[in-house]
Swiss-Prot record:
Pathway: Cell wall biogenesis; peptidoglycan biosynthesis. It comes from the Bacteria. The gene is murG. Keywords: Cell cycle, Cell division, Cell inner membrane, Cell membrane, Cell shape, Cell wall biogenesis/degradation, Glycosyltransferase, Membrane, Peptidoglycan synthesis, Transferase. It is found in: Cell inner membrane. UDP-N-acetyl-alpha-D-glucosamine binds at T29, G30, G31, N141, R177, S205, I258, Q303. One of its GO terms (cellular component) is plasma membrane. The lineage of its organism: Bacteria, Pseudomonadati, Pseudomonadota, Gammaproteobacteria, Lysobacterales. It comes from Xanthomonas campestris pv. campestris (strain B100). This is UDP-N-acetylglucosamine--N-acetylmuramyl-(pentapeptide) pyrophosphoryl-undecaprenol N-acetylglucosamine transferase. Cell wall formation. Catalyzes the transfer of a GlcNAc subunit on undecaprenyl-pyrophosphoryl-MurNAc-pentapeptide (lipid intermediate I) to form undecaprenyl-pyrophosphoryl-MurNAc-(pentapeptide)GlcNAc (lipid intermediate II).
């Protein structure tokens, strides 16, 4: 495939053209992409340009350009669950992707690279390491993803959303939207609040069928208590969720998407939701108690690991997704709906876990490492010096696979790289 050249995206007016960018590696899911976008916003506000490396056709190719960030993509996909034939060919595909990523890094000349996870993060991180560009990792979940596990072995700094993911980690938290972090303290919002208990149900962008079925059934079994329900269900499952509430004769506001999540958290007395890293970061930042139902099919059961962190602080209740979910949810709601003091205690416990300045801290650390380079492209060399720099500095612990990737990083005609380039535009 040939390289597609694009007009460079316009950076903010205060970002000097001579300032080298930070490269973000993130994609595949919103859980990887949105933290990267939050950090990109902070960096750009400080006058630091940002460039992005993702995978062909993945979610990031739609989301990132909306923020006026230039994105390059690699022809790479995940390896888990592949057949034996494809797995046998994986090393060759990975080496090609590392080689292509090396070409992108030489072209963009980033001062530092940070991986938030995703298909392209592996090749991009390996190429950064081999070219001597300062590499950082941010892992959102307590159970690390495969890519970040590998990259953590030779990253300059390993940052985490929750403590307990890696030895030598720095638990900086997961970035959240400013308006959520700015919400008043739980006591200010909840003490003295009258009327029905306000129950916020979050199924995520794709919705959660288990919650669509269990919440209406649990509320109906409780004899229709004084509860106001606001249920975010995703567009695809909206009709299904509305039908479930109608069948249970439970009044609820069913919405495919909630644009103002800060207002939704401020409204809520209790949240029922999945246990993705970004959602839990928001629940903690807002300061609201929660009933967590981890997605049963999540890779490495990482949502359960995330939920256990809040449960250990008495900020949440954990319910396993199985055939008895509705019955157990009924029992939990029966207790919590009748106990405002416990709901407040859970909300306050959640708030103590919050790290509202996570995006700022991550940006600080990136720029610290960008100024601490000793070799390669991350050491503040001029563009002319970078163009002349062809020696790849390798660590003695680099294994044979990295050696092979290193050998493939020497300049090759553009037409041999499976790369796509697009310029983001403000929309």
């Amino acid at each position: 495939m040939s390289v597609e050249h694009a007009t460079p995206v316009q950076q903010p007016a205060h970002a000097a053209a001579s300032v080298r960018p930070v490269m973000i590696l993130a994609g595949g899911t919103g859980g990887h992409i949105f933290p990267g976008l939050a950090v990109a916003k902070v960096l750009r506000a400080r006058g630091v340009p940002v460039t992005w490396l993702g995978a062909d056709g993945a979610m990031e190719t739609r989301l990132v350009p909306q923020h006026a960030i230039q994105i390059d993509t690699l022809a790479i996909s995940g390896l888990r669950g592949k057949g034996i034939v494809k797995l046998l060919g994986a090393p060759v595909r990975v080496m090609r992707a590392v080689r292509a990523a090396g070409f992108v890094l030489r072209k963009r000349q980033p001062r530092a690279v940070i991986s938030f996870g995703g298909f392209a993060a592996g090749p991009g991180g390996l190429a950064a390491r081999l070219l001597g560009v300062p590499l950082l990792v941010h892992e959102q979940n307590r159970a690390p993803g495969m890519t970040n596990k590998v990259l953590s072995r030779f990253a300059r700094r390993v940052l985490t959303g929750f403590p307990g993911s890696f030895a030598g980690e720095e638990a900086v938290g997961n970035p959240v939207r400013e308006e959520i972090a700015a919400l008043p303290a739980p006591a200010t919002r909840l003490i003295g609040r009258g009327g029905p208990v306000r129950l916020l149900v979050l199924g995520g962008s794709q919705g959660a069928r288990a919650l669509n079925n269990a919440v209406p059934a649990a509320l109906a079994a409780l004899g229709h208590p004084a509860v106001d329900v606001r249920h975010q269900c995703g567009e695809k499952l909206r009709a299904e969720a509305e039908a479930a509430y109608a069948q249970a004769a439970v009044n609820a506001s069913v919405e495919p998407f909630i644009a103002d999540m800060a207002a939704a958290y401020a409204w809520a007395d209790l949240v029922v939701c999945r246990a993705g890293a970004s959602t839990l970061a928001e629940v903690c930042a807002a300061g609201v108690g929660s009933v967590l139902v981890p997605f049963a099919a999540a890779v490495d059961d990482h949502q359960t690991r995330n939920a256990e962190y809040l449960v250990s602080a008495e900020a949440a209740v954990l319910l396993k997704q199985d055939g008895t979910l509705a019955v157990r949810l009924q029992q939990v709601l029966q207790t919590l709906l009748a106990d405002p003091a416990r709901r407040l205690a859970m909300a306050q416990a959640a708030r103590t876990l919050a790290k509202p300045d996570a995006a700022e801290r991550i940006a600080d650390i990136i720029l610290q490492e960008a100024g601490n380079g000793k070799s390669g492209m991350g050491n503040g060399q001029s563009t002319e010096q970078l163009q002349e720099h062809t020696v790849i500095h390798q660590n003695k612990r680099t294994d044979q696979a990295l050696d092979a990737a290193s050998a493939s990083l020497h300049p090759i005609p553009d037409s041999r790289f499976p790369i796509r380039t697009s310029a983001g535009g403000a929309q």
